[in-house]
Amino acid sequence: KEIIEGVKTVFCGPIWVRLSATAYDETGTQNTLQDYQQIAKWLEELGVACLDISTGGLMDVKPNIPIYGGYQATFSAQIKQAVSIPVTAVGLLHNPELGEYLLQTGQADLIQVGRGLIRNVNRLADAAQSLHDHDFQVYNNSYKRGQVR
């Protein structure tokens, strides 16, 4: 609460908060999904505009689960059930169709792609083409000549 209120004193824009919904810590010392759903509700009450849901990364623990495209999206979907503000999905969302599926099925409101954009600066244009989005326009005009038509 103190952090959000402090940020609001110096920043008037929308505040996004990243939650790591699990640390994959099998010792039983981490918060539960229900704990994170409650935290998400509190953040919404404080006026947070969006929740960026990820997993792992807080501890040096390798997940003891299968890693596949969209493996973190179930956490986004479960946090989304607890709040009415937008919730993002992340994590190996290399396939534009998978991202679109998560959006269309209500498991997330936004898809975030980090490493995919580092690997391919044309990622958004490629995704738009793959999804047959004929209305997509490149924001930076210098990239237009590189678009596949």
Regions found by a protein language model. Name each.
Residues K1-R149:
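Flavin-dependent oxidoreductase catalytic cores
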